[in-house]
Structure formats: C-alpha cells, structure tokens
C-alpha cells in the first residue's frame, strides 16, 4: 500500500529524526524535536509524530522518551537509483538529461508532496528567508503548471534559478527571498524562459556529511 504524502512540517520532523539517529545512534526526544523545529511545547512534536506513525513512516514505542523507530529506511535503501542530483545544465538540453546527473541520493521521491523528480544543489543565499540555504539540496517536482506565489525552478536564457514566481501582465517576476537582492524581470517576448518545476522540499547540506 502506498504511503500518504507528508506535509512540509512532517517531512522536516521526519528528516530530523532520521538525521539524529544517523549522527547519535538514537532517536531524539520530544523536547529535542520541539527545540529543533521551534515548537513551544513537546506536545506539538508528539502530535506530528503520531501523524507520521499513522502514515506509516515511523513506529512509536511506548515506555521510553526516545521510542521512535523509522519504518521506511529499507524502502529507500532498496531504491538503487534514488533521486538524481542535477549539476550544471548545458544550453538547449533538457534539465534531466543524463549528462547533467552528478550522482544519485537514496531519497524516496514519494516522501514529498507532490512527489519529487530530482534534486538541485542550491547556490547562493537568494532564498534564505524561507530556509533555502547555500549548499542545500532542493527537491523538485517536474511540472509546467505553476501558480503565482510558488517557488519555482526556472531556466532564463539557459541559466537555472530558484525564485518565487509572479506573473503580472506580459512580464514574469522571479522574486528572491533576500532583502538585499532585486527580482529578475523577464519579458518572454524578448528573453527565453521555461519553468522546469516547483520546489517541494529541502534537504540540509549537512544531512549527507
């Protein structure tokens, strides 16, 4: 049976639990989760853990503050390919062309909603206000159907960029989430622009160290 997709917050907590187990050898407590995510109370962490358990991603073990067991690691490990990491994109070629793939990460794309098709490494801090930081891996769902306000992966004159989309009249504005930067303004009648997909999640750069 296919697992339900996670919300962005559930995905963040799930990744933190996995990373904590990998780095310390034990699951985090509810207090540690609340501190990491920014909850005021461990009860909020408990509710999100229950949601993860209902969706089949973890098992909650009674009688211990660290009673969390990951249920989907084997599923990810059995995925020989995982999600491809896209590197430098050559002019005039599809973003997912085989020559652009640097490596694969053992990440199950179905853990994101909508499902991720590939990863992009973030360069720079243009989206730092919403937690997309330099060096992070951005999970991307491939689609041409986008709405104003979504964070998109766009190709502008063969340069790939991650920005928040706004269509206004004949122009397309690609807004950064950094007060020190100006938006990119594109007139499709004069410049080439193609929307490659939408951002559906972020994997911190230290998650694979």
Curated annotation (Swiss-Prot):
This is LexA repressor. It is an enzyme of class 3 (hydrolase). The keyword Hydrolase applies. Belongs to the peptidase S24 family. Represses a number of genes involved in the response to DNA damage (SOS response), including recA and lexA. In the presence of single-stranded DNA, RecA interacts with LexA causing an autocatalytic cleavage which disrupts the DNA-binding part of LexA, leading to derepression of the SOS regulon and eventually DNA repair. Its EC number is 3.4.21.88. SUPFAM superfamilies: LexA/Signal peptidase, Winged helix' DNA-binding domain. GO terms for biological process: DNA repair; DNA replication; negative regulation of DNA-templated transcription; proteolysis; SOS response.
